[in-house]
Amino acid sequence: MNNTIETILAHRSIRKFTAVPITDEQRQTIIQAGLAASSSSMLQVVSIVRVTDSEKRNELAQFAGNQAYVESAAEFLVFCIDYQRHATINPDVQADFTELTLIGAVDSGIMAQNCLLAAESMGLGGVYIGGLRNSAAQVDELLGLPENSAVLFGMCLGHPDQNPEVKPRLPAHVVVHENQYQELNLDDIQSYDQTMQAYYASRTSNQKLSTWSQEVTGKLAGESRPHILPYLNSKGLAKR
């Protein structure tokens, strides 16, 4: 197993950081790794807003659900769909197709994971902040995003000040299907629930008595940010 694979498999979300800054060289390398990511049809429809202003960091932390590490991380990056670049080049660009919004979301995720993997390869850590979408319009206004662009998620990066366990994932045979979709075997989920129950009960922080099935059922039982589609539409995206 090479160093790249070891780094990927050792991924943990880091939510507590030291006060040590990320160097300019490290930051530039992380960004270059992101820019090297695959891009659908070479459209390059992602923009990153690096937030260094402490007041804006404080507001973003509140918008994300009072996640203090948005303020304390050495770096905070916000990943956005961006077709305004293209509309500036050619005003006839039709950015309102849902397909283009999906491309922007997919490419943003690919770019962000490249950034995070590059950071982790340097001994840094990070965590995604999807909670920005709780207040997408307010975040959008704070960052001054133009038409044809939209906020997707944030990313905290810094030197880890914690050493959490690696969270067990679903087994590959549950996730990977051969030739066609296979019906779920609930015995596999029951076994995984036992694994996750042991993990939740024994991890070093935020211990709880729960299973994966209970967690995802609670998460998916109600509405999930119903304001997102109107927000995207208001930015000229995902209209048709």
UniProtKB/Swiss-Prot annotation:
<feature type="binding site">
    <location>
        <begin position="67"/>
        <end position="69"/>
    </location>
    <ligand>
        <name>FMN</name>
    </ligand>
</feature>
<protein>
    <recommendedName>
        <fullName>NADPH-flavin oxidoreductase</fullName>
        <ecNumber>1.5.1.38</ecNumber>
    </recommendedName>
</protein>
<keyword id="KW-0288">FMN</keyword>
<dbReference type="InterPro" id="IPR029479">
    <property type="entry name" value="Nitroreductase"/>
</dbReference>
<keyword id="KW-0560">Oxidoreductase</keyword>
<keyword id="KW-0455">Luminescence</keyword>
<comment type="similarity">
    <text>Belongs to the flavin oxidoreductase frp family.</text>
</comment>
<keyword id="KW-0285">Flavoprotein</keyword>
<feature type="binding site">
    <location>
        <position position="39"/>
    </location>
    <ligand>
        <name>FMN</name>
    </ligand>
</feature>
<dbReference type="GO" id="GO:0008218">
    <property type="term" value="P:bioluminescence"/>
</dbReference>
<dbReference type="GO" id="GO:0052873">
    <property type="term" value="F:FMN reductase (NADPH) activity"/>
</dbReference>
<comment type="subunit">
    <text>Homodimer.</text>
</comment>
<keyword id="KW-0521">NADP</keyword>
<dbReference type="Pfam" id="PF00881">
    <property type="entry name" value="Nitroreductase"/>
</dbReference>
<feature type="binding site">
    <location>
        <begin position="128"/>
        <end position="131"/>
    </location>
    <ligand>
        <name>FMN</name>
    </ligand>
</feature>
<comment type="function">
    <text>Catalyzes the NADPH-dependent reduction of FMN to FMNH(2). Involved in bioluminescence by providing FMNH(2) to luciferase.</text>
</comment>
<dbReference type="InterPro" id="IPR016446">
    <property type="entry name" value="Flavin_OxRdtase_Frp"/>
</dbReference>
<feature type="binding site">
    <location>
        <begin position="11"/>
        <end position="15"/>
    </location>
    <ligand>
        <name>FMN</name>
    </ligand>
</feature>
<feature type="binding site">
    <location>
        <begin position="167"/>
        <end position="169"/>
    </location>
    <ligand>
        <name>FMN</name>
    </ligand>
</feature>
<dbReference type="InterPro" id="IPR000415">
    <property type="entry name" value="Nitroreductase-like"/>
</dbReference>
